[in-house]
Amino acid sequence: MFDVIAFLVQEYRDFSACPGPDDLARKLAAVGFEDDVIHDALDWLSSLLAQGAVPEVLAESRLPRILTQEEREGLPLEVQDFVLFLDRVAAVNNVQREQILDRLMDVPPDERSLDAARLTVLAVLWRHAAEVDALIAEELMVAIDGPMPLQ
């Protein structure tokens, strides 16, 4: 599923340029993705799009985020640290952070890796057309391009 997300982020730099679900599914099938992977990815993205407005209190809160017991037990420690780091350095806002956590918790537990977290963050930022710091963008792109070689 995350291969489809990576493809979409690379193919459509602007989320609003994505075709509708039916056309997108046909294009993804033509590129070579399997139907079940396409279906899973489009459902996952649809859930991201369907997330409504959050309470204003959450959107404006400056309090640190404490993960729920379910999140602490369900997400690998490196994923927890990564998401909270992005929150702490204001690379994502509160709404984006909550969407990232929601989308990660919707993934099967065996797929909740650091690369999955990077791609989830990319998808959420892509959906919001958010500006991303160059160093953060480089870290996120590791999930697509692999680590940059040392020079």
UniProtKB/Swiss-Prot annotation:
It comes from Laribacter hongkongensis (strain HLHK9). Disulfide bonds: none annotated. InterPro entries: Smg (IPR007456). It holds the Pfam family DUF494. PANTHER family: PROTEIN SMG. Belongs to the Smg family. This is Protein Smg homolog.
